[in-house]
Amino acid sequence: MIEVAEFIAREVKKGKVIEVGIGFYTRIAKRLKELGFDVLAIDINKDAVVNAKNSGLNAEVDDIFNPNISLYMGAKAIYSIRPTPEMMNYILKISKAVKVPAYIVPLTGDPVPQGMKLITYRGIPIYKWEP
Protein backbone atom coordinates (compact mmCIF):
# COMPACT_ATOMS: atom_id res chain seq x y z
CA MET A 1 0.00 0.00 0.00
CA ILE A 2 3.03 2.31 0.40
CA GLU A 3 2.94 2.58 -3.40
CA VAL A 4 0.07 5.05 -2.98
CA ALA A 5 2.60 7.56 -1.63
CA GLU A 6 4.74 7.10 -4.75
CA PHE A 7 1.68 7.59 -6.94
CA ILE A 8 0.65 10.81 -5.18
CA ALA A 9 4.23 12.10 -5.36
CA ARG A 10 4.16 11.58 -9.14
CA GLU A 11 0.75 13.23 -9.55
CA VAL A 12 0.94 16.20 -7.19
CA LYS A 13 3.32 19.15 -6.98
CA LYS A 14 5.14 19.44 -3.67
CA GLY A 15 3.17 21.29 -1.03
CA LYS A 16 0.35 20.55 1.38
CA VAL A 17 -1.50 17.25 0.99
CA ILE A 18 -4.21 16.06 3.33
CA GLU A 19 -5.00 12.51 4.36
CA VAL A 20 -8.62 12.25 5.47
CA GLY A 21 -9.42 9.47 7.93
CA ILE A 22 -5.84 8.53 8.74
CA GLY A 23 -6.84 6.18 11.53
CA PHE A 24 -3.81 4.39 12.96
CA TYR A 25 -2.07 3.59 9.65
CA THR A 26 0.45 6.39 9.16
CA ARG A 27 2.92 4.81 6.71
CA ILE A 28 1.64 6.55 3.58
CA ALA A 29 1.51 9.98 5.22
CA LYS A 30 4.98 9.49 6.72
CA ARG A 31 6.38 8.44 3.33
CA LEU A 32 4.90 11.53 1.69
CA LYS A 33 6.52 13.65 4.38
CA GLU A 34 9.87 11.95 3.62
CA LEU A 35 9.32 12.82 -0.04
CA GLY A 36 9.06 16.51 0.85
CA PHE A 37 5.32 17.04 1.19
CA ASP A 38 3.67 19.04 3.97
CA VAL A 39 1.22 16.39 5.17
CA LEU A 40 -1.82 17.13 7.32
CA ALA A 41 -3.60 14.11 8.78
CA ILE A 42 -7.31 14.50 9.54
CA ASP A 43 -9.48 12.21 11.63
CA ILE A 44 -12.55 12.53 13.83
CA ASN A 45 -10.95 10.14 16.33
CA LYS A 46 -8.83 12.11 18.81
CA ASP A 47 -6.69 9.05 19.59
CA ALA A 48 -5.85 8.66 15.89
CA VAL A 49 -4.82 12.33 15.75
CA VAL A 50 -2.60 11.91 18.83
CA ASN A 51 -1.06 8.81 17.22
CA ALA A 52 -0.36 10.74 14.00
CA LYS A 53 1.25 13.58 15.96
CA ASN A 54 3.36 11.07 17.90
CA SER A 55 4.47 9.71 14.51
CA GLY A 56 5.80 13.15 13.56
CA LEU A 57 2.87 14.30 11.44
CA ASN A 58 0.79 17.44 11.57
CA ALA A 59 -2.70 16.32 12.50
CA GLU A 60 -6.08 17.82 13.34
CA VAL A 61 -9.44 16.55 14.52
CA ASP A 62 -12.17 17.29 12.01
CA ASP A 63 -15.61 15.94 11.17
CA ILE A 64 -15.78 15.75 7.38
CA PHE A 65 -19.57 15.60 7.54
CA ASN A 66 -19.40 19.15 8.94
CA PRO A 67 -15.85 20.19 8.00
CA ASN A 68 -13.76 23.10 9.13
CA ILE A 69 -13.02 24.07 5.54
CA SER A 70 -10.15 26.36 6.57
CA LEU A 71 -8.08 23.25 7.39
CA TYR A 72 -8.21 22.24 3.72
CA MET A 73 -7.36 25.61 2.19
CA GLY A 74 -4.01 25.75 0.43
CA ALA A 75 -3.85 22.00 -0.14
CA LYS A 76 -2.53 20.63 -3.42
CA ALA A 77 -4.53 17.39 -3.02
CA ILE A 78 -6.73 15.42 -0.64
CA TYR A 79 -6.52 11.65 -0.35
CA SER A 80 -8.06 8.87 1.69
CA ILE A 81 -7.16 5.23 2.15
CA ARG A 82 -10.12 2.88 2.52
CA PRO A 83 -12.69 5.42 3.69
CA THR A 84 -16.18 4.19 4.43
CA PRO A 85 -18.61 4.58 1.51
CA GLU A 86 -20.42 7.28 3.54
CA MET A 87 -17.20 9.32 3.77
CA MET A 88 -16.40 9.30 0.06
CA ASN A 89 -19.02 11.83 -1.06
CA TYR A 90 -17.96 14.22 1.70
CA ILE A 91 -14.29 13.91 0.74
CA LEU A 92 -15.33 14.76 -2.80
CA LYS A 93 -17.40 17.75 -1.59
CA ILE A 94 -14.40 19.11 0.31
CA SER A 95 -12.14 18.66 -2.73
CA LYS A 96 -14.65 20.49 -4.90
CA ALA A 97 -14.99 23.29 -2.34
CA VAL A 98 -11.24 23.93 -2.25
CA LYS A 99 -10.76 23.05 -5.94
CA VAL A 100 -8.07 20.39 -5.55
CA PRO A 101 -7.79 16.79 -6.76
CA ALA A 102 -9.11 13.97 -4.60
CA TYR A 103 -7.63 10.48 -4.54
CA ILE A 104 -9.52 7.60 -2.95
CA VAL A 105 -8.30 4.04 -2.47
CA PRO A 106 -11.49 2.12 -1.62
CA LEU A 107 -11.92 -1.25 -0.01
CA THR A 108 -12.58 -3.88 -2.67
CA GLY A 109 -16.26 -3.86 -3.53
CA ASP A 110 -17.08 -0.46 -2.03
CA PRO A 111 -19.00 1.86 -4.36
CA VAL A 112 -17.15 5.00 -5.44
CA PRO A 113 -18.80 8.37 -6.20
CA GLN A 114 -19.65 9.02 -9.84
CA GLY A 115 -17.28 11.25 -11.74
CA MET A 116 -14.10 9.70 -10.36
CA LYS A 117 -11.61 8.18 -12.79
CA LEU A 118 -10.09 4.78 -12.04
CA ILE A 119 -6.31 4.59 -12.22
CA THR A 120 -4.57 1.31 -11.45
CA TYR A 121 -1.09 1.86 -10.05
CA ARG A 122 1.00 -1.23 -9.32
CA GLY A 123 -2.18 -3.24 -8.94
CA ILE A 124 -3.83 -0.76 -6.56
CA PRO A 125 -7.12 0.82 -7.69
CA ILE A 126 -6.98 4.57 -7.07
CA TYR A 127 -9.93 6.77 -7.94
CA LYS A 128 -9.21 10.36 -8.89
CA TRP A 129 -11.37 13.43 -9.21
CA GLU A 130 -9.91 16.69 -10.42
CA PRO A 131 -11.34 20.15 -10.87
Curated annotation (Swiss-Prot):
Signal peptide: none annotated. InterPro entries: SAM-dependent_MTases_sf, UPF0146. Pfam families: UPF0146. Belongs to the UPF0146 family. HAMAP family: UPF0146. This is UPF0146 protein PYRAB01940.
